[in-house]
Amino acid sequence: ILGVSIYLITFAWQPLCAASQSQKLLIINSYNESAPWVQNYITQYLIEAANTENLDYDLVHMNAILIQTDSLYNLVKEQIFNRFKNNKPDYLILFGRMAFSLRDQIKNEWGDVPMLFIGANDNIVLNEKYLSGNKITASATKIHLSDIREQYNFTYIEVPELYKETIDMMVRMQPDMKKLVFASDNLAGNMELNEKIKAYLTLEYPLLEYEWLVASENSRKNIQTYLISSDQSVGILLGSWYYSRPSAFGYPMLVTGDFKLIASSPRPIFSLKEKYLESGGAT
């Protein structure tokens, strides 16, 4: 997937080599800057951009896990468009559905800019901001991206979360498993994934107990207890695990290190993306 997306981007940039005027690439990341799987893509794109003549680039992290209200969403959106008001991008790479939710304002303010949208789902909720912690998003009516294909100049690349295949593998590799724990934060995508996992377990493994452990200051000890335990009756499925807490100055501080215990865990840990495990953390 990474190779294909880099090829598409490189192909799109080829005419720039002959252009005399510098053009601009903007990457808007829904997640935070330390998200492992996203950073893997971003790093490669920035390398390609740096090696492309007449192409400047910039990067914005929306930090979706901190955006739980309309007012915060609107503030971040306003800051993005104000920042590039006099320096409009010629190309866009959008990671995640929160970034893609900016598409109407992108078209209105920046024109019909070519967009590469990278996400885990090929469906969206119209007029949805994908606020973290919003329970409505998971059950809202969705449309396929093909339904809006003619309205926007975008190419979609899916980075799938293979939850069904991963759960099947967990059952095979941990035959004594009686309980599955999905450990994640409350990003909109994880809230939707929680519902999908519950439905799949009900259908395929109705005797398997299920717990969705949501990242927070209060659940920190819970996940640490699971990680240091060798109890084979409990299977751990790792999603992204970020949350905020007040800093010494009273401002929200993003907590990212709880999953560093993975490296010393005596139990097998399963993940929806390999980069979670390579970094000892998650998106």
Residue ranges and their predicted role:
Residues 3, 16-283:
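Short hydrophobic alpha-helices and adjacent helix-cap/hinge residues
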